[in-house]
Amino acid sequence: MVYVKRIELSHFKSFGGTTAIPFLPGFTVVSGPNGSGKSNILDALLFCLGLATSKGMRAERLPDLVNNTFKGNRGSSEASVSVTFELHDGENLSEPGANHNGNGNGAKISKEWTVTRRLKVTKGGNYSSNYYINGETATVTELHEQLNELRIYPEGYNIVLQGDVTRIITMNSKERREIIDELAGVAEFDRKIVKTKETLTEVQDREERCQIIATELERTLERLAADRQKAEKYQALRQQVQEKQGWAKVIQYKAVEQQRQKLWGQLERDREQSQQIQQALDQRSQAIQTQQTELEKLNAQVKALGEEEQLAVAAQLATQKAQRDQLQQRYNDGDRQITNHQQQVGQIQAEISQSQQQFLHIQQEKSFHNTQTLPQLEAAVQTSQQQLEQLRHQAQAIASASEAWVQEQTQLSRTVNQLQDELIPQRSQLAQLEERQQQLLTNLAELTPLLTKVSVELEEKQFAQGQFNFQGEALTSQIQTLASDLAQLEQERSLLQETQTRLLKEQQEKQRQLDKLEAASQAQQEVQGTYATKVILQSDLPGVCGLVAQLGQVEPQYQLALEIAAGGRLGFLVVEDDGVAAAGIEILKQAKAGRATFLPLNKIRPPKGQNPNLSYAHGYIDLAVNLIDGDRRYADIFAFIFGNTIVFDTLVNARNHLGKHRIVTLEGDLLEASGAMSGGSRNQRSGLRFGTMVSEDTAEVKQLRQRLQDIQQVQGRNEELLLERTVRSRQLTQQLMEMRQQQREAQLHGEQTERDIARLSQQQTQINQQQINQQQKLAELQQNLALLQQSLPPLEQQLASAQQQLTALETSQTHQQWQTIQIQIRTVEAEYQRQLQALRQGEDHLKDLQNSSQRLEEKIAQAQEKIAQHQAQDLTLAQEQEQLKIALAEMNGAIQTTEAQLAKLSEKLGSTKQERDRLETQLNQLRSQQQEQQWQWEKLQTNQQEYQENLTQLQTQLEALEQDLPDPWPEIPLLQDRDEANLDFANILEELERSIRNGQKRLEAMEPVNMLALQEYEKTEARLGELSEKLQTIAGERTELLLRIENFTTLRRRSFQDAFDAVNKNFQIIFAELSDGDGYLQLDDAEDPFNGGLNLVAHPKGKPVRRLSSMSGGEKSLTALSFIFALQRYRPSPFYGFDEVDMFLDGANVEKLSKMVRKQAQQAQFIVVSLRRPMIEAAERTIGVTQARGAHTQVLGIKL
């Protein structure tokens, strides 16, 4: 928590020396007598942190803050204040002057942060003030930047003085609303709006300049249009003459060509006939040769057709059938593989079932073995062991009778028994070890491929997990980007929607205002009669010439006089005839649009009168009708309007002729012939003027129309952007949903893969551990096996030797009882050994059952994996079978085609002989015709030589004419759709030359012609097109700037409304706690808050609802304090200072205020200057302040 830890004052106001005042977090009260300087502590805070001016610290000038009893060297004085803050752990502040680009590279400082301000005053009254941060010089701007990082704001309410409460009470509602403006940052939006409006003004200026240029270009185009039209006509006529001259050359050439063509036609006909004969001869020769060749082929074909081609087609057919058989074989193999796989799957499933049955049988056998077999074998071993002990006791009793023999026999028997007892376990152990060794080797051989398989699968899963992790990170990044883009897009869309709604409301309001103004204007026009004329002009009635005011132009110096003289007659409608006037009257009746006066040109008669000769009179200008510039056809109209009205310069000069004539002055004074005079001051005229339409809109109407037009443009652009944002938002939402679905799928795959990796890792670890254990066991077993194999042979030799000695002893001297007992002992021992061996075999069998059970489980798992592999292979084979079916169908079609070809060849062989005989007959006929045509060709060659000599002469003449022919030849309309072979080109040429002479005369008549007008018009038109495109671009920029202004306006309103709602909510809560009543903030204009002010409305307990202005002094203070607390809660700071804000409150309200401060002190440090007991008692600590000997302020004590 940041808080003020210490304030050190040196010669500041009432503090004469250097005084350090420590503070702690929480609620501290500074108290002391009036005038003791307790409020100077808060002034010191304001001074040091630069939060107030000198007047805010109750001083006229800064030098007044220096203690007047302190003088330094050379008569100068100095005051300083240092404020030390305790920073929260991890709180960072940038160094003064460091870059504030938000890169987080600000220097970390210690937990204490000290601000010092020194004020030096020279002897002459000049002063300087310097700020220091941790001993380093800083500017006030740098200080405020770092204070902002600590949430201490110069414009905030960190320190509330007595005047602040009074100021809130006395300020008007608009100033009170501006407090919320400042909190909401409205000024920043205002600056942006002003800057954008400046840019908009520049764009509008550019648009106006371009519009002026465009208007000038349009006028230039209109001026060039006539010259361009004349130049185009001249150019077209000149092109026609030149074109006809080309036609004449062509027609002259065609006349000679016509003669040549006739001769050439005869020659060509002979040539064609000769060529036809020659071609016929060549064709017949070729036909003879062809038929001769074909005949030879048929002869050869008859011989060879039955063998070669038929064999080739048959071979092709055999190849195709072989390919079909191969495809069929592959298809059958695929079916067999699928069938085999299905059989194998069935076998594997049967094996799985069998293995499961075996597994169940083994489990049952294990259970039976554990519960019945082993307990029975253990009981039998115990019984045999007991019988053996009894027999041995009997043998010892018999042995006492024959001591020596028995001792020797006993010794040998004991030796044999000892050796047997030693050998039998070792032999059994050897067998067990050998069997166990085989089991271990088998287990190790099974574990190695299983470990390899698990390792490979584990690597695949780990690789897949890496892929899933990478995919998940990529998807997470993409989702974050999309979510950020979508959130930004939604903010933009919300802003656009809010702007659109606000503009719609404004549009409706502006339209209502415009409708009211237009209705009022229409009522005024109806009174003046101009509304009826507007209806007629807008009805597009044929024959309406316009208003009198529109039909003439007047110089500006005479305009006022003539408009006064004409009066309301300027609004009369001029029409072609009385029929048009009648139609106009009928329209007015139907529309109920009022009345109008029509002046039909065919009926109007000007008043008759004498032309007064007053040119001699002083100030005389002219007759009013002579000062109008207009079409002569409207002369009677203007004569009817003005009559004999005379224009004078001034009223003084006009008065000399009063009562004689109707006179108007340049200043607008009107003197009637009857002697009546009218005049006076001139108001802003809104009626008709010469050269204008019916009436002009007022500035307010123009402003409303322009605003509505701007709103419409902005709405159009806003709707486009809103639609774009909506479409883009839907796209991003869809993409985000798809990405999240992909992320969920990847996450599920990843989690499954993690479980598989954990399972495989555990399985790998278990297999490795099993391998290590098995290898250790195998090593130990092999070591024990080696020891046994070394120790068994000597023992077996000893046993054989002892058994031989015992046999010899027993055969040498037989003792019936001893032998009998020994036989019984050996029988019982053999039975004992057999039962003991059976017990050990039962235990080994149990171990075998356990191993078999484990192997069966592994076998079942492997079989299930094989089933999955076969099913995957069957799916691949089924796809290949479909492809083979398609290939077989295509091959069968090819085989059918080949078989049909082979059948046709077989049929053709029979008809070949008949074709050969027919060709021999045709060949003889062709040779006879060839001889007859040869004689005709020789005759035509003689005629062609005569024609060729005549053509040479005509060709020379054509070559001379060809030099002047145009290239390429033009199309001649005179010759189109006509047969040139039957035309008389001489008559056509004469008529064409006559037309050329007429065209040349017309060209001479049109000269001179400005041919440059064509290029100038095109250049001007191109420039106007470029300028139009530029105007469209500027209009787009203007719309974008308008939309930006509206968006800033929306954000400005939104920011204010958010701040207002939050402060209002805080005010309601705090006021309820302070006064046991209810209160709220009220805007004068909720629809447009910036158009009004802010009122504090309170309802103290037991009193009616009142505004701030109608409350008592205490209620005002309590309400103002509630407002200040609400502002502080909206923008919290680490510390606050109050200077006797409770002085106008009674005891009960002071107690409530102190509770509120104590509650707020849980979140921030409060330093309160107060003399009231409830405030002092509520504080966590109290600092006492007094005047030391009536001179300097002194801190007497600190109550902690």
Curated annotation (Swiss-Prot):
Domain named SMC hinge: residues: 542-656
GO biological process: chromosome condensation; chromosome segregation; DNA replication; sister chromatid cohesion
Major localization class: cytoplasm
Coiled-coil region(s): 202-528, 692-1046
Cellular localization per UniProt: Cytoplasm
A Pfam family the protein falls into: SMC_N
Gene Ontology terms, MF aspect: ATP binding; ATP hydrolysis activity; DNA binding
Residues holding ATP: P33, N34, G35, S36, G37, K38, S39, N40
Domain of life: Bacteria
A single cellular component GO annotation: cytoplasm
Region (Disordered): 90-109
Keywords: ATP-binding, Coiled coil, Cytoplasm, DNA-binding, Nucleotide-binding
InterPro entries: P-loop_NTPase, RecF/RecN/SMC_N, SMC, SMC_hinge, SMC_hinge_sf, SMC_prok
Chain's role: Required for chromosome condensation and partitioning.
Family: Belongs to the SMC family.
Entry comment, domain topic: Contains large globular domains required for ATP hydrolysis at each terminus and a third globular domain forming a flexible SMC hinge near the middle of the molecule. These domains are separated by coiled-coil structures.
Subunit and interaction comment: Homodimer.
Identification of the protein by name: Chromosome partition protein Smc
Species of the source: Synechocystis sp. (strain ATCC 27184 / PCC 6803 / Kazusa)
Taxonomic lineage of the native organism: Bacteria, Bacillati, Cyanobacteriota, Cyanophyceae, Synechococcales
Gene expressing this chain: smc
